[in-house]
Amino acid sequence: MKRVVGIGGIFFKCKDPEKINEWYKTHLGMDTGPYGATFEWKEDDDSTKKGTTQWSPFSETTKYFEPSTREFMINYRVEDLEALIVELKKEGVTILDEMATYEYGKFVHILDIEGNKIELWEPADH
């Protein structure tokens, strides 16, 4: 079973997400909006399928990264989240919540061995 197949997003804390978005737009040409920027790309094995990677600044006061005390969180794309959760539980990995399903995919949060919160995402188109 494949586990992680790519990076789904980079999330980080900052003092002023609006100013950060504007800076990256002005100086690096990123097409930023209220939630950061979305980078589109095509799947290697099927060029008709598009994938995305999200770049998102969060307020430095966000609770979304808890219980981690880090200033960042990485979202990893996976192929079969339900099966992966079963395996991670068997391996003793800390699973922070129940799998949530939205129109754009399934999500669950885990902790790595250093306490970094990780978001696992199975896109809806998989």
What do these predicted ranges mean?
Residues 28-31, 75-77, 97-100:
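Short linear motifs in intrinsically disordered
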Residues 1-5, 11-56, 90, 108:
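Core segments of cupin and vicinal oxygen chelate
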